[in-house]
Amino acid sequence: MRRRDFVKTMSAAGASVLLPHRTLLAQTAQSLLPEPRVKRVMVMFKCHFDAGFVDTQYNVVHKRYFEKFFPEAIEVARAANAGGKRRYVWTTGSWLLFEYLDQASPADRKTMEDAIARGDIAWHALPFTWQTEMMSPSTIEGSLALSQLLDKRFDKATTGAKMTDVPGHTRGIIPPLAKHGVTFLEVGVNGGSTPAELPPLFLWKNPAGASLAVMYHHEYGGVAVVPGSDLALVTEVRGDNSGPHRPEEIEKIHANLTARFPNAEITAASLSEMANALAPYHDKLPVVTQEIGDTWIYGCASDPLKVARYREISRLRDEWIKRGTLQVGDETDVQLLRHVLLEPEHTWGTDTKTWLDFDNYIPSDLARMLDTKNYKVVEFSWIEKRQDLMDGVATLPPSLRGEAENAIRALIVPAEEEIAGRPIPHPPGKPIETTYFTLGIDPRTGAIMRLRNKAVGREWASEKNSIALFTYQTLSANDYARYQASYLTTKADWAAKDFGKPNIERFGAKREEWQSVNASVEVTRLKRSHIASVALHFDDEQAAQSGRVALPLSIVIDLILPDDKPIIYLNLTWRGKPATRMPEALWLTFNPISEDEKGWTLDKSGEWISPFDVVANGNRHMHAVQKGFAYESGGHRFEVETLDTPVVALDKRDPLVFSNDQPDVKKGFHSCLFNNCWGTNYIMWYGEDVRARYILHA
């Protein structure tokens, strides 16, 4: 996220004015050739919303937007439009406006209602910017209820949407948006990140024929002339949580647009007005059918508990919808989602480079800092994000709330496991015979090295093609230099700090991987299942004592094989992991025997997508999956449902990869249990016990 990036520009009077960089895209128009054929220019104004970052989420929302920015925007728009022309309309996501109207005093609410009636304040269809790969189709649908309720209240029809900062999204968002009348999505990419190779305006289609017009550009805002028309669309987006434009900025923007489009009428507009103006020209737009993906998705593996809770409640909500207990967009759903939707919002805490130092990385140094003011603020901002989900659960009717609380409680890792039955030590190399499978465990790594489906004789694993291979990985300054050289589009100081970990070389950071050197296996025969418990053992005490490595004290993989169906429940549990700021990643690799690389697909927000169908400069290396990933060929199918850990790397087991090479899927699918490799506002250390659950269909 490009932060505190300000540049000086000259106002119309020649005075020096300090403005956020994102407002300046239209202001560069004077350096461009005039475009006299354009007769209509529609301009959308907003600032980028981070639910946190510069401060805690509460302070950003209430102290900045509710107490300061909304009143300022109302007055700025009133003054700008006083002459009878629409020169300024301030747009916000639906969530901020919905919350403001719900919480404001009667007088402030009336002032806002009057501004909306005048057309001075507008909202778009989405609550805010998400990392959309973290969302189910029904969650996306449910989120639209906020804008639909505002539409009903103010007699509007919202058809336009915007997301800013996150470089790309999944094709799975198209059907739920199109289903509810959203026809236009504007995407402004973070200025330090490589944008996907896409036209500035295109029609994004999925295989079923659903479509969405998209405006895409490498800045928060942009300018696009609609093909085959006299229309230009402009989005003017101020910097992060920076509020409405100043009057002198508005004048400068209009002046520059007039210079670029001398024959055009320039009008401030909402995104829905822009969407409706663009609609007649959809058939003139280039068509894109590929996945784009999110090159920031590796950050979403930084808080395993938050993500596990969110995914559990999302699945439970889908079950309630299926049962008819809850309907998408009803009052119960809205009250739940107005909190839960903040979980996949793209801001996960406060700005690490502002609040933290670059000296206290190793576990012993970090432990000494955790009680200091800035570190406590950062940790609070992460806890605040987790609390959003709990606040949503608290709004549920008692019966649903009880279900949700029980589901969340079940995610707590107990200090010790309750042992069912009588575990019997089992030689790791010796096959384990169950009703449906012959199972073999690697005596060193503890991974599955044999998995034979007895009914069809299909062998899925071998010593070369193992399943559920655990790896602990550390990274180096060279890894960050390589990654930044391939991905960043700027050498600005903020980018190196956001996308790096300055000074880690001083603390001995190395790129290394650790796998178990000795696995012990116990098998328990229960009435209706077998349980194979695999304990992993590591041998590098020197690395741990140096602070370079923060391996858990205990890692156990439980394989539960029921007698009534050919599936395996796989639970990986770690306990006693030291918290560290040194870059680390924990992985579970699935690399079954496969013959046809084209047989692999990933479920992303409800659409099964080929890993080879991703646009250039999209994310071809890493995805967040909804249900899981699967291989199918020759009438046989191997599927991994990943209940808690959605982020999956393909080919290289590495969170810091940006490449246009197609992935070599024969090197495996690596489920990221946790990483702290990205800075910005993600979780930087994690010392809690973790359980990651999977279901294998073979």
Give the residues covered by each predicted segment:
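N-terminal export signals
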Residues: 5-26
